[in-house]
């Protein structure tokens, strides 16, 4: 069982058209998901659909219909292939933690308040958002300097 994202490829193709119609450009997507090898792992034989209602998670979208948020993980390999098919370059793919650290989060937090440092820690902690969320960068050419992928690039896993 898996989720199907019929509009995903069309969205990427439309994005590529718009980026190429201008002076070029780049797009970065941050979401929770996996490269294809992990996305279709046997442990996820029932897909990745999750439902959230009143701060509780469960996997049955047919319970309490209309009263909760329903979400699914992104197949980042599918995103990368759609981008390449549309003429875009994949600048990089990594976890949110590496992306933010590569952009200088640690240096920015050195003089931040305790509350701000605590919030930043949640963004990069591997047991919270740091590893769960992934980032993929797409651009009209590989000439874009995508600093967020300097260390920890996982493009080879796509």
Predicted regions located by residue number:
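Long, Lys/Arg- and hydrophobic-enriched amphipathic alpha-helices
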Residues: 1-158
């Amino acid at each position: 069982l898996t989720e199907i994202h019929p509009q995903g490829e069309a969205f990427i193709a439309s994005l590529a058209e718009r980026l190429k119609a201008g002076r070029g450009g780049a797009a970065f997507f941050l979401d929770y998901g996996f490269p294809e090898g992990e996305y279709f792992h046997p442990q996820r034989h029932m897909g990745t659909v999750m439902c959230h209602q009143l701060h509780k998670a469960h996997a049955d979208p047919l319970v309490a219909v209309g009263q909760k948020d329903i979400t699914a993980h992104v197949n980042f390999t599918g995103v990368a292939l759609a981008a390449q098919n549309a003429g875009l370059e994949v600048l990089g793919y990594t976890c949110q933690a590496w992306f933010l650290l590569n952009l200088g989060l640690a240096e920015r937090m050195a003089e931040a308040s305790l509350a701000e440092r605590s919030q930043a820690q949640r963004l990069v902690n591997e047991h919270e958002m740091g590893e769960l969320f992934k980032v993929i960068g797409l651009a009209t050419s590989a000439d874009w300097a995508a600093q967020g992928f300097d260390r920890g690039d996982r493009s080879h896993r796509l």
